[in-house]
Swiss-Prot record:
GO BP annotations listed: potassium ion transmembrane transport
Annotated protein name in UniProt: Ktr system potassium uptake protein D
One protein family per Pfam: TrkH
UniProt keyword list: Cell membrane, Ion transport, Membrane, Potassium, Potassium transport, Transmembrane, Transmembrane helix, Transport
TM segment ranges: 17-37, 46-66, 75-95, 133-153, 194-214, 235-255, 297-317, 355-375, 380-400, 411-431
Protein topology in the membrane: Multi-pass membrane protein
């Protein structure tokens, strides 16, 4: 029996193994979150609630069918923070750390798993990268929790309560988990610009991409004035920053005469910036999202669909996919066959992957929304918003999550899971491995457009 199980595991592809590990993580999360000690007395808790919360926390989405503050005890909050940590940093990153502590050698198979889990394209330096990522994320969360916890002493009566809220907020923001224990997201801090600024920084650190953090760290400690940033870091940083800025301007323009009417300029500035940053995958909000106009909600859907960067805590099609699509469109419109940026020519295989990811994501969002329009009674925009939030593992909601039917919740859970592991991993999971063609047929042109 044991031998057969071992052969079955060996027969699985890296993508299938990663999916299996995340499934096991969800199972463990369900068990831990269902422990009586994890709940407050009298809390209403069902299996579907446990499963949904487990998938949401492992995928670091933040959509929830229960009120976190009213449902979970202090022990439950610690368990939730642990699951967010596990899902945010990545199973293989933490697995690498455990293997190294146990003195085990990281072999070729383990390196392949790490590559799939973190969307990396090469073996070289992968283990060292994971060690640096874990070190950086834990330090960011620690200092974020320390700063917020100390600051929260002005809000809460005891050190325990202040630092509990501070460290949970830091972990939730850095992992882009979207969970909160205030019971009202970041709305209680809508006029506290310091808390908003620190939270935005933590969201960015988690969503911009682990390789970018490592390169920035190396740059800061480098003795060379001209540090050779990789093409990935250049494209990711510019795209990520542009989306945050463009998103803030768009939200401001659409809400200036609506939800933002009559507010001070600094309130409007932080409202626009925070909501735009949260759409990268943060999931926290300083305003009731349902108060926003339909045009703004649709705009936010597009931002959530793009999501965070590859090899980060977030989901969506990813910022580099969006950037490559725009670059391909720009060069095609100018009559250029090759796509060039920063004195480099992009590989046709990467351009094809970005197109495949985008098309598959559109089909997934369309299909999930279509199913929800059949099973649910909410408006099309509300359902589309929920699906985009799940796919981008964002966690923003118009307040309909708890009202979804069991079928609707299952659909959202599937979308959250795919959003976390990534479209490419999902395709490799259900399809075959990449193979090189041994022969080619004659090429023929097809009329397009």
């Amino acid at each position: 029996m044991r031998l057969k199980f071992g052969k079955l595991i060996q027969a699985l592809s890296p993508a299938q193994l990663i999916a299996l590990y995340y499934f096991l993580a969800v199972t463990v999360a369900v068990i831990l979150l269902s422990l009586p000690a994890a709940h407050k007395p009298g809390a209403d808790w069902t299996f579907i609630d446990a499963l949904f919360t487990a998938v949401s926390s492992v995928s670091v989405t933040g959509l929830t069918v229960v009120d976190t503050a009213d449902t979970f005890s202090t022990i439950g909050i610690f368990i939730l923070a642990f699951v967010l940590q596990f899902g945010g940093i990545g199973i293989m990153t933490l697995g690498t750390f455990i293997w190294l502590i146990m003195g085990k050698r990281i072999g070729l198979k383990e390196r392949k798993l790490i590559m799939v889990d973190q969307n990396q394209s090469q073996f070289s330096g992968i283990v060292n990268l994971m060690k640096q990522v874990l070190f950086l994320i834990l330090w960011i969360e620690f200092f974020g929790g320390l700063i917020l916890g100390t600051y929260f002493l002005t809000y809460y009566d005891s050190y325990q309560e202040a630092y509990l809220h501070g460290f949970f907020a830091s972990i939730s923001a850095t992992t882009n988990g979207g969970f909160d224990i205030t019971g009202n997201s970041m709305i209680p801090f809508r006029h506290d610009y310091f808390v908003q600024f620190i939270t935005m920084l933590l969201i960015i650190f988690g969503a911009i991409g682990f390789p970018v953090l490592v390169e920035v760290k190396d740059f800061l400690f480098s003795k060379h004035r001209r540090y050779p940033f990789t093409l990935f870091t250049k494209i990711t940083t510019i795209t990520f920053g542009s989306l945050v800025l463009f998103g803030a301007i768009g939200i401001f323009a659409l809400e200036a005469n609506h939800a933002f009417a009559g507010k001070s300029w600094h309130d409007i500035l932080f409202l626009s910036l925070f909501q735009s940053t949260a759409t990268r995958s943060g999931g926290l909000a300083t305003i009731d999202i349902s108060q926003l106009s339909d045009s703004t909600l649709f705009f936010i859907c597009a931002l959530m669909f793009i999501g965070a960067s590859p090899s980060s805590v977030g989901g969506g099609i990813r910022t580099t996919t969006f950037a490559l699509n725009l670059l391909a469109l720009f060069h095609f419109a100018r009559g250029n066959k090759a796509v060039k940026v920063f004195k480099r020519e992009l590989h046709p295989a990467d351009l094809m992957k970005s197109l495949v990811v985008t098309m598959m994501a559109i089909l997934l969002v369309f299909g999930a929304t279509l199913i929800l329009t059949i099973t649910e009674k909410h408006s099309l925009l509300e359902l589309l918003f929920e699906v985009c939030s799940a796919f981008g593992t964002t966690g923003l909601s118009l307040g309909i999550t708890a009202d979804l039917s069991s079928v609707g919740k299952c659909v959202i859970m599937i979308v959250m899971f795919i959003g976390r592991i990534g479209i490419l991993t999902f395709l490799y999971l259900i399809g075959r491995k990449e193979i090189e063609a041994n022969y080619h047929y004659p090429k023929e042109r097809v009329i397009i457009g």
